[in-house]
Structure formats: structure tokens, C-alpha cells
Amino acid sequence: MAEVEQKKKRTFRKFTYRGVDLDQLLDMSYEQLMQLYSARQRRRLNRGLRRKQHSLLKRLRKAKKDAPPMEKPEVVKTHLRDMIILPEMVGSMVGVYNGKTFNQVEIKPEMIGHYLGEFSITYKPVKHGRPGIGATHSSRFIPLK
């Protein structure tokens, strides 16, 4: 019985981005990272990050540094929906503006290479109710309340 319990210990899959694990990604330069990214992200990094993107990275670094050990860092709010998620951003909390409110997003390793805007939906998904009068030809026979 004791042997069975020892075998049930869960092992988690180690994260890799295109065959490179997270520790190696953090040590890479932007030029080496660009080789792993898709064409759109390569083009964006090749053209360079602007001042706003650099200030976001600076604020994220500061929030991570000021956070107590083993706790999540402070949320950093931003309107930069077009910011590409870089490996150094992993573990940060970002408030991404959706046009109305800031949606809190915790950056996970699986998000590397995606845009911040992909994780903050800008519209409210439709919740369809019952069809009204004139919705279809058969709806003429639906009794009114």
C-alpha cells in the first residue's frame, strides 16, 4: 500500500517555449529571442520597443522587486494592448485596459509571444434570450407571455 502511494506523486510538465525552457529564455538577449518568435513578433522587436513599452517593462521590474518573497507583485495598469509578452514579464500582474475597465492578468509562461490585448476581451459576449416576434417565420406561433 505504501509503495502505491509513493508512485502517485504528481510530476508536472516543465514549460518550454519552442524547445527552450524558461530559465534559458530569461538569460537570452532580444536577438536570440527573436529567432524563436513568429514573423510578426520578430518584425515588431526588430523595429524596436518604443518609450511606452520600455516604461511598462521598467514599472513591471520595480513591482517585482518591491514584492515580498513568495507573493504576487503589485498590479501595473496599462493601455498597451499591443505589447508582446516577453519572458521577463512572467509572474507579473498587469491590468490591461479593455476600453472601459482594467482586467487583471497574471502573466504565465504559456503567454510568451502573445499580445497583452489577447487576454483582455473588449466586448461583452452575447447571451441570447428567447426569440422575439418577427425573429423567424415560425416565431409567429410562439405564444406571448
Curated annotation (Swiss-Prot):
Locations listed in the record: Cytoplasm
Subunit comment: Component of the small ribosomal subunit.
Keyword Cell division found: no
GO biological process, one term: ribosomal small subunit export from nucleus
SUPFAM superfamilies: Ribosomal protein S19 (SSF54570)
Any matching Pfam family: Ribosomal_S19
Keywords: Acetylation, Cytoplasm, Isopeptide bond, Ribonucleoprotein, Ribosomal protein, Ubl conjugation
Cross-link (Glycyl lysine isopeptide (Lys-Gly) (interchain with G-Cter in SUMO2)): K108
InterPro entries per UniProt: Ribosomal_uS19, Ribosomal_uS19_CS, Ribosomal_uS19_euk/arc, Ribosomal_uS19_SF
Primary subcellular site in the record, as a coarse category: cytoplasm
PROSITE patterns in alphabetical order: RIBOSOMAL_S19
Function: Component of the small ribosomal subunit. The ribosome is a large ribonucleoprotein complex responsible for the synthesis of proteins in the cell.
Family as reported in the entry's similarity comment: Belongs to the universal ribosomal protein uS19 family.
Protein name: Small ribosomal subunit protein uS19
Ribonucleoprotein listed as a keyword: yes
Natural source organism: Bos taurus (Bovine)
Gene Ontology MF term list: MDM2/MDM4 family protein binding; RNA binding; structural constituent of ribosome; ubiquitin ligase inhibitor activity
GO cellular component, one term: cytosolic small ribosomal subunit
